Amino acid sequence: MTGIYIHVPFCAKKCPYCAFFSEQYGRKTVDNYVKAVIRNLQLYQVNDTVDTIYFGGGTPSLLTAGQISDILEACSKYLHLYQPEITFEFNPTGKRNTYLHDIHSAGVNRLSIGTQSFSDSQLKLLGRTHSVNDGIRTVETAFQVGFNNISCDLMLALPEQSELILHETLETLVKLPITHVSAYLLQIEEGTPFSQNQDLLARCLDDDQSADRYLQTVHFLEDAGIHQYEVSSFAKKGFESRHNLKYWKCVDYLGIGAGAHSCYMGKRFYVPEDVSQFCDGEHQTEIILSENPYDREERIMLGLRTVEGVPAEWVKSQKIPLFQKAGYLRIGENGNISLTAEGFAVSNAVISAMI
């Protein structure tokens, strides 16, 4: 089973913490971009069965519901679909009821809402244009129009994010009709406005405080029946992201759009971050990153991001006993090595030391 990722690299406003590729929204450019996406879906001639489609960005909700419908009609026409999970990233501002109803009718069956926080002061700090009330109303409206698989994004370890502020955000979150949470630690990326804001940098949490907020989130969600299955991913039973699991389990996925990455037919490649080139070309350009995309180190690195872990025989590191003693690793009855919640809190350091 193959997954399809459709990248929509347009934003109405760039968030000050974001280092991802995006361009300013323009109607004519977006119209041409959608046509290029459909053209590439036809040209790739994917022979394998496709069971997940993911619209990511950028801000996919800048596309009209009609454009989403056109893309999904092309997917149905040119791909071999089988009971697909179709995820759509949605920004909780502006259009809600009619738009959500229309994309649900078009076939979108999973919504990923960029709430980020349920604290107005923290949303303001992040430069977000929506309020707490906007986030709540978006989730509730999505549920009312028929979405029964709803994920919310949370950002952790924000400047001045106290235990109380995070607790209130988590309390608000779990009262909503959601099935999934993606929770990410704030990363200060070079070249972003955040990286140049000395006042903000002085208010950032240290590593220990960041780990505390992460573990607070893990334990709170677990108590609410939203279980961790990957370092940043939590779900009610049966609602794990089928698309994202492909990344961590080394299953083929094909990215369509400027800046999209793929691991497909034995190659890892990406499309240049150039909207004009993507729109003007008959077929999207592929830049090869690797022709051995799932080597041993890659499988270990990705597998250790999951609660399931990897077979112990894959890992030859002499640091296993040290990390076990520190409470970062465990070896299960099935013989798999996996990270504990405490290990996930420092996963980058632990995983890099293991491969």
Language-model regions: role of each:
Residues M1-V8:
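Immediate flanking context of iron-sulfur cluster ligation sites
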Residues W314-A326:
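Short amphipathic alpha-helical interaction segments
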Residues M1, A19, E23-Y44, T49-W314:
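C-terminal scaffold of the Radical SAM
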Residues P9-F20:
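Local cysteine-cluster metal-coordination motifs and their immediate loop/turn environment
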Residues G335-T340:
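Minor-groove-contacting beta-hairpin "wing" of winged helix-turn-helix DNA-binding domains
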Residues E342-I355:
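Short, amphipathic alpha-helical interaction segments positioned at domain boundaries
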Residues K325-N334:
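A short, conserved structural fragment
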